[in-house]
């Protein structure tokens, strides 16, 4: 709890609450709340691709062929006005054996600086973000029986992510579930 709290209170890394800044931060690997990400400098200096989620070799709309489509229970973990939902999910036409318009995970669209023509779905891995420190602090406080402190950290995170979020007090199992979700 103390280590996470020191990072949160240090002020160097702040939660991003602006939807456009959040989406651009994931696309361009410029998310200001990132404590550490693996650096890549161009098309010849790449890590893993995340094409599993979208996979579109032509770059044309309507030709997505994902290997993974999130189920409703995953999508339901996010409020529709949550800036994470807006940045990480998109309704797309797909051309797998199932044809239609589905909500896909687009969290790793590919940083334009890391490809030359059609996206390669490579983004710099964001290994640690301050948002995770809020969840670590909430979980640590909950494990110590400090539900009010845990609720504060969880609510601080949700206020930054979900416009019009109303703070609430969590306790017991409801607190644990809220942190994990």
Where is each model-derived feature located?
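Acidic/polar-rich alpha-helix caps and helix-coil junctions
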Residues: 1-65, 76-181
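Residue-level signal for threonine
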Residues: 70-71
């Amino acid at each position: 709890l103390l280590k996470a709290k020191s990072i949160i209170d240090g002020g160097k890394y702040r939660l991003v609450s602006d939807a456009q800044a959040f989406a651009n931060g994931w696309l361009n690997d410029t998310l200001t709340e990132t404590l550490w990400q693996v650096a890549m400098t161009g098309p010849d200096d790449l890590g893993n691709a995340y094409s599993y989620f979208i996979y579109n070799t032509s770059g044309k709309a309507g030709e997505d062929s994902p290997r993974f489509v999130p189920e409703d229970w995953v999508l339901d973990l996010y409020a529709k006005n949550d800036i994470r939902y807006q940045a990480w999910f998109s309704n797309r036409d797909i051309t797998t054996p199932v044809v239609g318009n589905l909500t896909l995970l687009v969290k790793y669209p590919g940083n334009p600086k890391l490809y030359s023509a059609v996206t390669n779905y490579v983004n710099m891995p964001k290994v640690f973000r301050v948002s995770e420190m809020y969840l670590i602090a909430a979980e640590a406080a909950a494990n110590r029986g400090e539900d009010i402190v845990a609720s504060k950290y969880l609510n601080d995170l949700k206020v930054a992510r979900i416009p019009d979020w109303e703070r609430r007090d969590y306790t017991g199992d409801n607190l644990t579930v809220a942190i994990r979700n």
